Amino acid sequence: MQSARVKYGWLNVDKPLHMSSGSVVGRVKKIFNCKVGHAGTLDPLATGVLPVAVGEATKTIPYAVDGLKSYAVTVQWGSQRSTDDAEGEIIKTSSLRPSADSIREALGQFVGNIRQVPPAFSAVRVRGVRAYRLARRGEAVSLPPKEVCIVSIDLLSADEESNTADFLIVCKKGVYIRSFARDLGASLGCFGYVSFLRRKSVGPFSEENSVTLDRLEALADADVLNEALLPISYVMGDALLRLHVDAEVAEIVKKGQSVSLQRTSLNGLYAAENYDMCYLSRVGGVPVAVCKVVNGTARPVRVFDV
């Protein structure tokens, strides 16, 4: 049952194992009965934080994917798999066992701005077709490297008995953790793949305040879904200037018209000198629009129908 009071906002969903991000969106859409989208795909074998936008919040998805992401990952040494995780077929093996010291020494080459080749089994498009579809058909997939950024990699433990290593990785968008495992294993000469992956955070979303799908359905049954929803402004971060407007200005902006920032609160014209974008809301937090700042005016680019 959908709560009549709930129309829009963000959810911090804890994606379960063996479920695709698209399937999570489908479950949430059924609960809320409105448009739903997610920010940042998680592989079916990964768990953890999946930000999900509900209703008008889908207009702010681009702002949610720009934040830093953190992952807890276990790499299994000794073999390379077709998917670079435990799901794929073994294509190479090695009897080498890397020491903790050798792993630490190799990590430096993967920190900072690096070039990374996405896994063959990925959503990257090749001639208009998803790479994983070609790979599943047995076609050879050659993907060009991408410029990505890994902020930090911490080696948490190295177990020579199980031949695994645990890492905490902080990175920007576009990084494939499976590619990191593959490339680190190759550099160590022992091969490697991801045997466990959990996303701990995406921007302001963290696993500590995430909600399971079962919990969402329980809240829906109790008609209190608003308890799980976060405001649209939750994903805005520091890149956008936040300003309050009165009812008159809000109506002008909602018609797609620009307004002078002198008409906003908090001396908007002065504050906007260091910003390219701004987020306008009514007093009380009701969202109005995301606007581009142009010559002292707010020009709407995303208007919220709430």
UniProtKB/Swiss-Prot annotation:
Which terms under GO biological process does the entry name?
mRNA pseudouridine synthesis; tRNA pseudouridine synthesis
GO MF annotation, one:
tRNA pseudouridine(55) synthase activity
Listed name of the protein = tRNA pseudouridine synthase B
Family, similarity comment = Belongs to the pseudouridine synthase TruB family. Type 1 subfamily.
Q: Which reaction does it catalyse?
A: uridine(55) in tRNA = pseudouridine(55) in tRNA
Q: What is its EC number?
A: 5.4.99.25
Q: CDD domains given for it?
A: PseudoU_synth_EcTruB
